[in-house]
C-alpha cells in the first residue's frame, strides 16, 4: 500500500534541510490566512490538502490574491484569481522566466537580500556552471567534487561580501547570468503559455 507520507513527504525533509538548513516546515498553516499573495504551483491544494485550503480561503476573504499554476484546471484553479496552465514538465522554465524578470527589473527587496541571504557573497573564482554541468564533475565516476562550490573567504574563514549585489562574482550576479536565458518569449514557446 502506497501513501502520501512516502510519496510526497518522504522527500521533503532532505530538500528543506538543503535549502533552509532544517527539514521542518518553515511557516505555519495558521499564518497562511494572513498572506497577501498565495502562489500554488503543481498542486491541487483544494483536494490534496483541504485544511490548508481552508486557510487559503480565509486569506482570500481577507483580500489576498490567489495564483494557481498547474498543468490542469482543478478545484484550486476555480477559486484562484489567476490561473496559469503550463505544458507538463515545463514549470522550471516558467519559474526561470519569472526569476529573470524579477532580477532584470529589480523587483526584489534589496535590503532583505542583503540582511537575510547570500546574494552579496562572492563565489570562488573556480566555481563554474558550463553547459548544465557544475565545476568539479568527474566524468569517469559521474560524481562531483563540491570543493569549488563555496564562497571566497576572509582570513577568519567567513564569506566575503561585496558592496553591491551586481558586483561580478556575487551569488546574485551568477544567478542573474544563469537566468538571463529564460526570457518570456522562450518560456512561452516551451510552456505553451502566451506572453
Residue positions per predicted region:
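A conserved hydrophobic secondary-structure block that centers on an alpha-helix together
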Residues: 27-75, 83
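Short low-complexity, flexible loop/linker segments enriched in glycine and/or proline
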Residues: 16-19, 56, 82-84, 100
Amino acid at each position: 500500500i502506497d501513501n502520501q507520507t512516502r510519496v510526497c513527504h518522504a522527500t521533503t525533509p532532505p530538500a528543506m534541510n538543503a535549502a533552509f538548513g532544517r527539514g521542518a516546515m518553515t511557516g505555519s498553516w495558521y499564518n497562511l490566512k494572513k498572506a497577501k499573495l498565495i502562489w500554488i504551483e503543481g498542486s491541487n491544494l483544494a483536494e490534496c490538502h483541504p485544511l490548508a485550503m481552508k486557510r487559503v480561503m480565509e486569506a482570500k476573504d481577507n483580500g489576498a490574491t490567489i495564483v494557481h499554476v498547474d498543468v490542469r484546471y482543478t478545484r484550486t484553479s476555480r477559486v484562484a484569481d489567476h490561473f496559469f496552465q503550463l505544458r507538463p514538465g515545463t514549470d522550471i522554465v516558467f519559474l526561470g522566466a519569472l526569476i529573470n524578470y524579477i532580477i532584470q527589473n529589480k523587483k526584489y527587496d534589496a535590503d532583505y537580500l542583503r540582511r537575510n541571504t547570500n546574494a552579496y557573497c562572492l563565489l570562488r573564482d573556480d566555481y563554474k556552471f558550463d553547459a548544465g554541468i557544475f565545476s568539479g564533475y568527474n566524468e569517469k565516476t559521474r560524481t562531483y567534487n563540491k570543493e569549488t562550490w563555496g564562497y571566497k573567504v576572509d582570513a577568519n574563514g567567513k564569506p566575503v561580501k561585496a558592496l553591491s549585489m551586481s558586483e561580478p562574482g556575487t551569488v546574485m550576479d551568477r544567478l542573474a547570468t544563469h537566468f538571463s536565458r529564460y526570457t518570456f518569449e522562450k518560456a512561452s514557446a516551451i510552456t505553451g503559455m502566451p506572453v
